[in-house]
């Protein structure tokens, strides 16, 4: 495969590279826009890489960038003769009549650099296809990651000096101090929950676990709706259990306060039709993207979310539910190890895309054997490393689910059993089952909201 490209000259524009360097010699201020677009490795000719690097070092010391200082810098690093000597630097200084077009020239250099990296990446992918014996999904995931890195021009990965991090951290603290409210992450729309968590933080993995039919899907959908309709964030929902149409039916009920049974059967009153029209209008303007592929792999989730973030932006990911995600096949032991691998991958995804990932989880039947049915960490099915990977573990508990005579009808407890960077505790919400909707508890006493028998 490499022979295909061995006799071809890689994409490059020596003239544009010379124009960039010449513009900096002509006007040192041109280094600012040039350095915002280019790094030394973007230059094709090795001599140009060294010259641009020398310019950056001189500028970093606060010295003027000109023919004299750059010559001295290259001489000090014993690179002056390697780049062609003072005579070549003088040629560069006379290469352009004006520095006004430096950004245009830099874009040409950048474009050629991206093409070269793309060729190298494609060659590497093709070579892997011939020689690697990994699972096809592993190869596809790696290929997608490599291509995305090229398209995003990632120059990250180096060490970060703590002084730079401290400056960014101080600016962030100052911003938080000056903003209204206590929310530092993405608001869920539930007052007490947001107060306890400060909103769901970017890069966090949030596990929401409950027994079947307690309301975890409705809870996650409510959060997704609140985020998508009340903020500018887009939400990606992966539904492995229900179809996209079933999810949207639930969303319409919650958004329009429409009885779910009436909507399922089509027996809508004139008032319901009005509510449905308003709910459809609200949701159609929301940035909600649904994928209902069953038995999807984490690699597929990652690839689709990377693409969505690049094309439209992404603020949150919801997965219903974790145990239905298909393993990579690399774990030869048992399903628990596969689920552990999946949870680690979801945490890595949250960090990579800098969005909160909400993953729903089933609970084992062991919770049914206890006097107190409130869930515990050990109740998470095939838990493995889920507890370790998660930044927040939230259990949903309804007393009236187990006790039909409960005094706390329609009340659901959101038990924050783990919060890596915050307190643990319990938040109560009202659950309007007919609407598939959770509301803040202070609104529960507006009886008009809650149908009889909810």
Swiss-Prot record:
Name of the top EC class for this enzyme: isomerase
**What family is this protein classified in?**
Belongs to the helicase family. DnaB subfamily.
Record's comment describing the protein's domains: Within the hexamer the N-terminal domains (NTD) form a rigid ring, while the C-terminal domains (CTD) form a looser ring; the 2 rings stack to form a double-layered ring. In a complex without DNA or bound nucleotides the central channel varies from 25-50 Angstroms in diameter. The NTD interacts with the helicase-binding domain of DnaG primase. In complex with ssDNA and an NTP analog forms a double-layered, right-handed spiral staircase with a small internal diameter; 5 of the 6 subunits bind NTP. Closely contacts 11 nucleotides of ssDNA, the 5'-end points toward the NTD staircase.
Q: Which residues bind ssDNA?
A: 381-382, 384
Mutating residue 362 to K: what's the consequence? Partial loss of helicase and ATPase activities, still forms homohexamers, ATPase and helicase not activated by DnaG primase, still interacts with DnaG, binds ss- and dsDNA in absence of nucleotide and less well in presence of nucleotide
Domain spans labelled SF4 helicase: 179-445
Q: Which Pfam families match?
A: DnaB, DnaB_C
Superkingdom of the organism of origin: Bacteria
Protein name according to UniProt? Replicative DNA helicase DnaB
Q: Where is this region: C-terminal domain (CTD)?
A: 183-454
Upper classification of the source organism reads: Bacteria, Bacillati, Bacillota, Bacilli, Bacillales
Which keywords does the record carry? Answer: ATP-binding, DNA replication, DNA-binding, Helicase, Hydrolase, Isomerase, Nucleotide-binding, Primosome
Please tell me where ATP binds in this chain.
Answer: 213, 215-218, 250, 362, 418-420
- An example molecular function term from Gene Ontology annotations: ATP hydrolysis activity
Q: What else is known?
A: The gamma-phosphate sensor residue (Gln-362) may sense nucleotide binding/hydrolysis in the active site; it is also important in DnaG-induced stimulation of DnaB activity. Other possible gamma-phosphate sensor residues are Lys-216; Lys-418 and Arg-420.
Question: Which residues does UniProt mark as catalytic?
Answer: 241 (nucleophile)
Region Linker helix: what ranges?
A: 163-176
């Amino acid at each position: 495969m490499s022979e295909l490209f061995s006799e071809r000259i890689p994409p490059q524009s020596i003239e544009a590279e010379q124009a960039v360097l010449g513009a900096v010699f002509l006007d040192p201020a041109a280094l600012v826009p040039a350095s915002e677009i280019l790094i030394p490795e973007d230059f094709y000719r090795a001599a140009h890489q060294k010259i641009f690097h020398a310019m950056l070092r001189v500028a970093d010391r606060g010295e003027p960038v000109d023919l004299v200082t750059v010559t001295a810098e290259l001489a000090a690093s014993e690179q002056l003769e390697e780049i062609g000597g003072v005579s070549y630097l003088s040629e560069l200084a006379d290469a352009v009549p004006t520095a006004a077009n430096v950004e245009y020239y830099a874009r040409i250099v950048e474009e050629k650099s991206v093409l070269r990296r793309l060729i190298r990446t494609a060659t590497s992918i093709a070579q892997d296809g011939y020689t690697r014996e990994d699972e096809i999904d592993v190869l596809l995931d790696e290929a997608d990651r490599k291509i995305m890195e090229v398209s995003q021009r990632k120059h990250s990965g180096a060490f970060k000096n703590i002084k730079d991090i401290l400056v960014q951290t101080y600016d962030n603290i100052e911003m938080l101090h000056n903003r209204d409210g206590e929310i530092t992450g993405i608001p869920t729309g539930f007052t007490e929950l947001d107060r306890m968590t400060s909103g769901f933080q970017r890069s966090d993995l949030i596990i929401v676990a409950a027994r079947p039919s307690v309301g975890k899907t409705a809870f996650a959908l409510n959060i997704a709706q609140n985020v998508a309709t009340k903020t500018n964030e887009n939400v990606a929902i992966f539904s492995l259990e229900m179809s996209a149409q079933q999810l949207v039916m639930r969303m319409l009920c919650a958004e329009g306060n429409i009885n779910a049974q009436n909507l399922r059967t089509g027996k809508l009153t004139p008032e319901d039709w009005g509510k449905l029209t308003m709910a459809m209008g609200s949701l159609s303007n929301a940035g909600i993207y649904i994928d209902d592929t069953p038995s999807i792999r984490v690699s597929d989730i990652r690839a689709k979310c990377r693409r969505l973030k690049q094309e439209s932006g992404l603020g949150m990911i919801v997965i219903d539910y974790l145990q239905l995600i298909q393993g990579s096949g690399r774990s030869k032991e048992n399903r628990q190890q596969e689920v552990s691998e999946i949870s680690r991958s979801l945490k890595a995804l949250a960090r990579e895309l800098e969005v909160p990932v909400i993953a729903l989880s089933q609970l084992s039947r062991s919770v049914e054997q206890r006097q107190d049915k409130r869930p515990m960490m050990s109740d998470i099915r095939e838990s493995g490393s889920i507890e370790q990977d998660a930044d927040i573990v939230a259990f949903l508990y309804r007393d009236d689910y187990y006790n039909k005579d409960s005094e706390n009808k329609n009340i659901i407890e959101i038990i924050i059993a783990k919060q890596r960077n915050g307190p643990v505790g319990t938040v109560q919400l009202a659950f309007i089952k007919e609407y598939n909707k959770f509301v803040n508890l202070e609104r529960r006493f507006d009886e008009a909201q809650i149908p009889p028998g909810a």
